[in-house]
Amino acid sequence: MTSNTLHYTVEKSSILGPEWQSLYSTAEPVDFDKSHFEQAMLNVIRQPNVNSTVILRADMLIDNEYDLESGSCVKSEKKDIALGSDEGILKVNIDDLAPRSVPIALADVTTKFQFVRRIVPRNPFKDAIINQTCLVMNSNSDASTSLVIYIPHFDNAELCPFYIPQVAAVGILLHDHQLSVHYIPFAGQKELLFDPKQRVVRTAFRLLQTAYKHSKGVKDGYAKRVMHDVVVDKVLFQDQYIHLKKKYSKFLVDNWAESTDPKKHVFEDIAIAAFLIELWKKIYGAENTTNKMQFRDLGCGNGVLCYILIQEGFKGLGIDARQRKSWSIYPAEVKRCLKEQVIIPSVLLRPHPTMKLHAPHLQHNGRFFPMQLVSPQLIAPATVMYSSADLLQSPQVNIAEFPPDTFIIGNHSDELTCWIPLLGYPFMVIPCCSHNLSGNRIRYAVRDVERAKKLGNSTYQGLVDRVEYLADRVGWKTEKEMLRIPSTRNAAIIGYKNDKLNEFPTDEIYSILMEEGGADGWVANTMNLMKSNPRGH
């Protein structure tokens, strides 16, 4: 919707009564009905970040439903949701839980839904957490009328945070097939509403745009393609994120040593760290989680994720083929945990289990891996042969044989992505660029036709599908979470349950390797990573 499709109605009296000020209304009758409007607005009430990117979430503290004829409460839910305990979090009247009301002159309007929500901003050290009453009201005399009202739990404009309009109440009304927005201004602030350039007026315009867009979307059958918060509770994740962001973001952004955008990488890795910490509490138990497991971040890149996890008390290592400039900014206890090594999975170097049974003394499989060298000192390209025995002994090679309590992280780990479910440890992998087990670029197709229609058949979706397929084949019971990170490549595939874990490497893994040609190019490709420039995702 544009200014041509919305009328600025500030000169008109509000249908809601003398306390209210009309702001905007649709120029033409809307083509959706009350059910579409209410479904959309109930979602906006629960997901206020739809209206403002400054908002992180809403905690629904009170959820009441009323019978329109009798006015009696037919459903009542109250939740005590704890807030983070970090010092410096700003709060305004968050102990005020009594639902509020405002005068309404519209005839026969009664409350259908009544909520008290706590709005949590992304940065509660800058913007205050507040409580707000949300009402959905219907008319007993006009079945097509619906009114949504927002009332903050404070009476002073100076207490109003940046992320909501600075008014005493907001009303969004569907009546006579027109959609309109109305305010009750704070004392002495009514004149501001007569200037369309004022932020509070521009906000009214956007609120009406959102209400129209989402109501129309419901009517047109819009369905969310992405579901968040499937594996880890949203509140636990977001509170952990707020805590970590406050603790680490300034140091990391101020001391960024890479050429890439620090804010994108820092805040993305803070979110991934928050998710992992809450995931590990779920898997290993919330008590003493740091003593029950350790991690290996394969393809750790700039090391931000490792830095945060180690500083939070977790034991682990970050491994990458190339050291990054950022490694130099971390304290000594973190630097010691960042290793410049290439990953060559031991399944490529060790004897097959059947061979090992007949010759228990064997430590390597006797394979040789060719690699071409080009140098000005050579009269022609030369081929070097690496033996499995030499690679097993090389300090520059990590063969991914870790302690049993290891959890593997693959955060946009490119060539390693498809390998991670095959290594025999619980894991979380966030796919990015598509490579096969030889380290060559490849495009996988989504296997299921119906799934491809629903999710798309992009290179990325094909890679995600491939990782899930490989994990399933070797016995992992996987879960998938669409992470709340600033990246379109945000699918996390998680596996921590596998009845065959003590049998790795299984026959199925060798079958997969045979199907991919033995992964013969892996050694050469991974060695080349040591010479190439780091990628910035």
Curated annotation (Swiss-Prot):
EC numbers on record: 2.1.1.211
Cellular compartment(s): Cytoplasm
Chief location category: cytoplasm
Molecular function as annotated in GO: tRNA(Ser) (uridine(44)-2'-O-)-methyltransferase activity
Keywords: Cytoplasm, Methyltransferase, S-adenosyl-L-methionine, Transferase, tRNA processing
GO BP of this protein: tRNA methylation
Pfam assignment, any one: AdoMet_MTase
Protein's job: Probable adenosyl-L-methionine (AdoMet)-dependent tRNA (uracil-O(2)-)-methyltransferase.
PANTHER family found in the cross-reference section: TRNA (URACIL-O(2)-)-METHYLTRANSFERASE-RELATED
UniProt family annotation: Belongs to the TRM44 family.
This protein's name: tRNA (uracil-O(2)-)-methyltransferase
